[in-house]
Each structure stands twice: as structure tokens, then as C-alpha cells.
Amino acid sequence: GHNVIGELVGSEFPDEIITIGGHLDSWDPAEGAHDDGAGCVQTIEILRAFKAIGYKPKRTIRFVLFANEENGLRGGNKYAEEAKAKNEKHIFALESDAGGFTPRAFGFTMSDEQFQKVLQWKPLIAPYGCSEFNRGGGGADIGPLRRAFPTTALGGLSPDSQRYFDI
């Protein structure tokens, strides 16, 4: 399989890239609704919403549906490999790979200075039930990006997972 990529080109800093994504595959015979259908839908919905309101980002935002996360990270590895070959400037990557329930927290892997800036977003997000901002976060698909570009900040969404494995 291949990664599926959509992009909104930045108006002021088009060479600075923010990646948002989830992965297309799941474990057979599971249907993959939470791992990671929800992350794919969330990624597509962010792009759809931005397009619907005519949002023009300052930086380029890439919306990536990664291939083959469950069996070798081929999509994430290829994305990072191609980005490095093109000498792209990836400043932030956010992955949703933990289901589609109510958001409760975000985890971030970034410098102390970046984390202090991100903490300023907390009051904007807390009314939606997402009240925790923690150190350490990211995702399997965006991990290769951090290895290719050590200064790339990573984020991961942590939804309420108490019913993740309910039958």
C-alpha cells in the first residue's frame, strides 16, 4: 500500500510543515474502527473543516493516512525517508492512534520552551473535556519523522479508552 496525502500550503511559511495523521491498516480480522479508522476519520475531518471555512494556514499542513503501521511502519518510514531526501523542514507532527472516544489528554515530545508555549492552548481545549497536557507523546507513524529530524515536535491524542476493548 501507499500513504495517502492531502496538503494545505502555507501562506507565510510554506516550507515549514505540520503533519497530522493516522494509519490505514488494522490487525486482521479486526475491523480497525479504533485502530486506526478513527484516526483516519479525524485526519480527514480536520482537512474537510479547514477547507469548509476557507482556512489559510501560515505553515503547510499535511494530512497523511499512513500505510502499513501494524506490520512494519512502512508508511511512516517512507514518509520520513522522502522528507529527509527532500530536506523538508518538519516542525510538528500529530498522530491519533488510540481510538475515537472523547479526547482527554495530549502528550507532547518537544523542547521545554515549546511545551511551555503549548501549555497556553490548554484553556482553549479544556472546555471540550481535554484537560491534560503531558510530556511524552507522539505515535508510531510519526516516530520516524522525529528520528529523521530530531527537532520536530511530536504530539499524540489520548482519548478516554475505558471501553476500547469492550465487546
Question: In which residue ranges do the predicted regions lie?
Answer:
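Extracytoplasmic/secreted envelope proteins and their assembly/folding machinery
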Residues: 40, 44-47, 58, 73-80, ...
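Short helix-loop-beta-strand segments that form the rim/entrance of peptidase-like active sites
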Residues: 49-74
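Acidic, glycine-rich active-site loops and adjacent beta-strand->loop/helix elements
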Residues: 24-26, 64-72, 97-100, 122, ...
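Loop/turn elements at helix/coil->beta-strand transitions in domains of secreted/extracellular proteins
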Residues: 14-18, 57-62, 87-92, 126-130, ...
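Soluble metallo-hydrolase cores and metallopeptidase-like ectodomains found primarily
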Residues: 1-33, 45-55
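Soluble non-cytosolic domains of exported or imported proteins
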Residues: 33-41, 55, 70-74, 112-116, ...
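A glycine-rich helix N-cap at a beta->alpha junction
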Residues: 81-104
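Active-site-adjacent substrate-binding region
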Residues: 101-167
